[in-house]
């Protein structure tokens, strides 16, 4: 736990559909703020023993993207985040967090660890998301397996973020420049 001279660590969760810029923006925020970042894309693959760089394009809600395996992935990621918080380390949990129970579980962990909490919801137009996902798929770069079909599936099951007070939740439209989105988040974290 923290003594009076140690600043409270932050637990930040991202949420939003694939292709909205969560990882791109939060990798930069993590670098600027010195926060650790845990990504569901890497953790999911590590749990099945494959390299995060290996792409596993499965249908929405199938294989390592099934409801059961997704639940296991989120629980593991949140537990790993809790370990860092208890060491006084600020951490970003980079994932879609489409379900209220996932977001609420992370919030409870932050409270128990006496950490500050922020849910950052990422949005952009469907056209922009589709463009980004097509570019990502064509380039085969990064660890994400997100594609347009996944975006469409996530959109159908994404539960509105209405469980947090305004001071615990911000929405960032990533249609503007990356720098602008990063600056909005940094400014919010420094309040």
Put a short name on every predicted segment.
Residues 1-11:
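Extreme N-terminal, non-catalytic leader segments
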Residues 14:
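Hydrophobic anchor at the beta1->P-loop junction of P-loop NTPases
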Residues 42-45, 97-98, 123-130, 176-178:
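Conserved nucleotide-binding/hydrolysis micro-motifs of P-loop NTPases
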């Amino acid at each position: 736990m923290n003594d009076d001279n140690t600043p409270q660590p932050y637990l930040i969760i991202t949420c939003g559909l694939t292709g909205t810029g969560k990882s791109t923006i939060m990798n930069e925020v993590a670098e600027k703020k010195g926060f650790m970042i845990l990504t569901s894309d890497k953790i999911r693959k590590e749990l099945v023993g494959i390299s995060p760089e290996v792409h596993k394009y499965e249908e929405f809600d199938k294989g390592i993207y099934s409801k059961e395996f997704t639940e296991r992935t989120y629980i593991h990621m949140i537990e790993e985040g809790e370990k860092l918080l208890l060491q006084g380390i600020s951490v970003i949990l980079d994932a879609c967090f489409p379900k209220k129970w996932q977001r609420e579980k992370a919030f409870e962990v932050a409270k128990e660890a006496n950490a500050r909490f922020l849910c950052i919801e990422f949005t952009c137009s469907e056209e922009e998301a589709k463009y980004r996902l097509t570019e990502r798929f064509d380039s085969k770069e990064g660890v994400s397996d997100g594609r347009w079909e996944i975006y469409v599936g996530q959109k159908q099951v994404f539960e509105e973020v209405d469980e947090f007070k305004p001071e615990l939740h911000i929405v960032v439209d990533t249609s503007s420049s990356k720098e602008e989105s990063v600056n909005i988040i940094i400014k919010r974290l420094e309040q």
